[in-house]
């Protein structure tokens, strides 16, 4: 969902586009210095030498507790980006979320969220976003954490489907993400296809794509526990599962229907 929000920021002119270079002095002399937005969205920032997939290797700190500013000063100070390849690290999403606030300011960011979720998506309940609990009030820092009802998540998926089909600016953003997808390399494991993240061959700007290795534009969002939303843009189909645990047959309930 952070990526979808990013598309709206681009369409409002706050960011030049997915190929723009991150412009924030806190990134100086870190792996994000001169990084392209699309590489960060694609989990290809080169952070794999410093991050174990959940925590930072040298400090064991969890990125969802500490501000982006703190992380750049401690864990990633004088860091050098590794190979440009897919490596899932939630820090990348936190960087994008925080970068939006840096470019927009909190006031404009909150205004845009209202325009997206209330006016466009039509949510019926609140959306709660999670900021790092050890950050300072007013800091331009945010995590990927987001809470909303299962029906409001579905409404977001419908809005994405409509954007794609109506070729809105945000819809073109989603198509650009798909055109700039990257291979997941060894992370693609069709022999262990019980989960969407294993079954998808590519990654496109925060979305799993390439179900069964196919080239059809089906976007997959995998969240906490058993949260799973699948959007088939060509066939106007959405399948959403909002279970607490992931102990369900994904191939039977989801994959077999595409």
Regions from the PLM with identified roles:
Residues 11-48, 75-78, 104-143:
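Active-site helix/loop module of the DD-peptidase/beta-lactamase fold
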Residues 1-17, 40, 96-100, 153-156:
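Active-site SXXK
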Residues 92-99, 144-166, 227-244:
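Active-site-proximal alpha-helical segments within enzyme catalytic domains
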Residues 123-131, 179-239:
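Active-site Gly/Thr loop motif
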Residues 249-258:
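Short, gly/Ser/Thr-rich active-site loops of penicillin-recognizing serine hydrolases
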Residues 57-65, 131-147, 192-197, 202-205:
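Carbohydrate-binding/catalytic loop surfaces
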Residues 112-183:
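Active-site-proximal binding-pocket segments
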Residues 39-42, 87, 125-129, 145-147, ...:
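Structural recognition of the beta-strand scaffold that forms the well-ordered cores
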């Amino acid at each position: 969902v952070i990526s979808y929000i990013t598309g709206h920021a681009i369409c409002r002119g706050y960011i030049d586009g997915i190929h723009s270079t991150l412009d924030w002095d806190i990134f100086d002399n870190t792996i994000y210095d001169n990084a392209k937005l699309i590489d960060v969205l694609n989990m290809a920032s080169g952070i794999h030498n410093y991050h174990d997939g959940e925590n930072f290797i040298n400090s064991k700190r969890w990125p969802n507790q500490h501000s982006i500013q703190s992380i750049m000063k401690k864990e990633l100070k004088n860091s050098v980006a590794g190979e440009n390849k897919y490596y899932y690290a939630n820090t990348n999403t936190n960087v994008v979320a925080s970068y939006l606030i840096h470019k927009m300011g909190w006031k404009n960011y909150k205004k845009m969220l209202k325009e997206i979720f209330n006016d466009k998506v039509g949510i019926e309940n609140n959306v709660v976003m999670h900021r790092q609990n050890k950050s300072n009030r007013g800091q331009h820092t945010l995590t990927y954490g987001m809470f909303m009802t299962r029906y409001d998540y579905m409404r977001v998926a419908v809005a994405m489907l409509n954007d794609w089909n109506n070729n809105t600016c945000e819809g073109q953003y989603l198509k650009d993400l798909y055109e700039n997808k990257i291979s997941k390399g060894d992370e693609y494991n069709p022999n262990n296809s019980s989960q969407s993240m294993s079954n998808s061959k590519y990654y496109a700007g925060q979305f799993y794509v390439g179900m069964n290795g196919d080239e059809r534009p089906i976007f997959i969002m995998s969240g906490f526990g058993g949260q799973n939303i699948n959007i088939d843009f060509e066939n106007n189909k959405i399948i959403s599962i909002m279970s607490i645990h992931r102990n369900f047959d994904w191939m039977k309930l989801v994959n077999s229907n595409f």
